[in-house]
């Protein structure tokens, strides 16, 4: 069994910092726009709800074969948080697959932040013992599809819960 731990990932403009409970207050503001839930459903979390969620997330998966990896996206020049990226790494077909996702606050969208963060995450995961990346994207979410494509993922014919499965095979490490 391979367990992977989140480490800081540095890109040209961003620091992807391993998630800490202390990020909840600032992230609640970043993620406060209800429009962020247009494709996923739900509503923005309060700081207290987000703190509780982050406590669960940083506690790790109850399944020792699964690694929960979560980062906040920090804009280095502005020294502020702008979103999150995550990877759930689990055994699949004799190897490890990372299910990845990203979200960038409305105020920071349209600046290539999600693309840069997803590319940084994909590059880092490619240095881990992960054989494949997977993302599930709503078919109408064109911006998220563009991020997935920029991170090297391609859409498949598979669907899950109304979303298209995107995949990228990695060179085994």
Identify the residue ranges that each predicted region occupies.
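Conserved G/P- and acidic residue-centered "switch" motifs that form tight phosphate/ATP-binding loops
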Residues: 79, 112, 141
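Conserved active-site alpha-helix within GNAT-family acetyltransferase domains
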Residues: 115, 140-156
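GNAT-family acyltransferases
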Residues: 1-107, 120, 124, 128, ...
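Generic recognition of short, well-ordered alpha-helical segments
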Residues: 31, 99, 113-116, 146
